[in-house]
Amino acid sequence: IDIDDEITRSYDLDWAKTPGSTLFYIKKKLEAAGYNVTFNLYNSANFGSPQIRERVVITCTKSPNPVPYLRPTHSNEEVFGLERWRTFRDAVAGLDPARCDHIDFSEKRLKYIKMLKPGENWRNLPKELQPEAMGNSYHLGGGKTGFYRRLDWDSPSPTVVTHPAMPATELAHPTENRPL
């Protein structure tokens, strides 16, 4: 059984011990059905995906021995003989840019995207422009790292979403002034 769940860095795997939490409920139901349950937080980049995508993976077995944790095949650092993370450049290598259709950013969004270098987001805009660029979102909590975000050629992509031109999930091309 493999269950994916949208998560954030604040996700706490102790929820499996917290009555009322979804993870607690799932774990208890699986254990009641006779399964030995193992779960952990995994980053897809550590398994060869050219994007940073953290997910909880639950594995179950009827065996009395728990399923071992998954072993990464890639790393952000050169350790344990693992391959380096795959990058956005790796993912798009060989694609013909002339054949890539895309939508355009609005003029307002484009104004700020043009100011960003590869790998930057709204926090890299001049301080005096940040409130104007972010509007009401400027005063909200959370990291807001998806706003005015330009990809970096030599890093994995953030989680790829269906619509890369929406304000909170923007993915701008590393060097072209357009969404993916």
Predicted regions and their residues:
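Bulky hydrophobic/aromatic "packing anchor" residues in well-ordered structure
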Residues: Y42, V92, V160-V161
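C-terminal target-recognition/interaction regions appended to catalytic cores
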Residues: S106-L180
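Short, solvent-exposed loop/turn segments at secondary-structure junctions
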Residues: S44-G48, S63-N65, P164-A168
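Flexible, glycine-/basic-rich loop-and-beta segments that form/coincide
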Residues: S49-D104
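Conserved Class I SAM-dependent methyltransferase catalytic core
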Residues: I1-T61
